[in-house]
Amino acid sequence: QTNAASDNKKNGRSSTSVTLTQSANYPEAYKDEIMKTIRTVENDETNDSISYIFITDMHIDTSEETREVAYNQLYAIVDIANNSDIDFVCVGGDMYNGRYADPNGKVIAMDTIESISKILELCNKPVFILKGNHDDNSFSAQINEDLLFDADHIINREEWYSITMKHFSQYATDYQNGYYYYDIPGKNTRVVCLNMSDSDDTVTDGKQNQMGMYFYGYQNEQIDWLLNDAMSRDNCNYIFLCHDAFDYPEGYSTESNRDTLRAIMAAAYTHTPFAANSFAKDFTNWSGNVLLYHSGHLHMERAVFDSETGGLPLLNTQTSMFSVQSRGWMQDKGYYMDSGRQKGTATEALFDVVVARKDDINIVRFGVGDDYSLKKK
């Protein structure tokens, strides 16, 4: 264990000594970065802010080096979470590549994902895990095409829950198929976790009806739940978390409800009526307030007030994966990707700590890259 004192004070809160219980599990070079992150977040926080850690697209089985750096980052997250006043930790999906085609491939895949959950159980804060398009192991069919829709290799919804949010069930209110919400105590804020890989796992003759490699999107049941259950709390702030947002259409069909979700977000943020397909909700007198929508998937970084979504603050965190194979999926609209990651130093890491208030969002970078902000003028 490593102890370090900090005497920062903010709004009458004084930071106590910092105890890095996981310091044996990441490089020595992380320690200064952890202390800097804790202090920066503490200085940014106010009584009306929400703060959280967001790490995404780890793809930890890309190489042994990638896996090692991913675990380093997860243990660092534990120490930051446990020595700060952040409100929660979110894993944004695509935790691995989902290509285990061995006869026991599903077991290997589930063990890989659950190893992440087990580390994050060391956090004394809520943990939310989002499902990405790679996470059901259906990309095993890229290794062996005979495994297309093969239920023996694809992680179904019950199995997904057992290796992810079952470990954090107290933070998964009204859990459905990878989507759920949580009300942050004392903060008048509801966090809504969505599932862009909401595939139908009905099995017929050994074949699953849909799978993550081919189905991107939100079933009608999820949209109905979002409108009538998740967004039903009055007079509170809302944060939406999902593996993907709206800028990269590849993988989505016309039945994916992707555009429906975007229209809901725009209407909720601007307090205007929404109607699309068979869904409708008049947000004109809705008493909720949408703070932001945060995602990954593109392996690129960006924070904007998105004009195509009614001016909604959209945050996109780039991939935390340490690999020469790492690349981004958007080359326009202001997306970017940090370079210069160096193994064995803090720059091998990359995740964001967000401190959010209405129209005022600070993004604190752990690892390579710089802190930045999104503020309405």
Task: Show which residues each predicted segment covers.
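Sec-dependent signal peptide cleavage junction
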Residues: Q1-D7
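N-terminal active-site segment of His-dependent metallophosphoesterases
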Residues: G12-K106
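Extended active-site neighborhood of metal-dependent phosphoesterases/phosphodiesterases
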Residues: Y30-T37, A101-W225, S307-N316, S320-Q342, ...
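Structural recognition of the beta-strand scaffold that forms the well-ordered cores
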Residues: S51-I55, D87-G92, N97, P126-K131, ...
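Active-site environment of divalent metal-dependent phosphoester hydrolases
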Residues: D61-E64, N97-Y100, K131-A141, S199-T204, ...
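Active-site-proximal segments of metal-dependent phosphoesterases and phosphodiesterases across multiple
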Residues: G105-M110, D200-D224, M231-L292
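Conserved beta-sheet core of the metallophosphoesterase superfamily
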Residues: S253-R357
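Short, solvent-exposed aromatic-acidic interface loops
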Residues: R365-K375
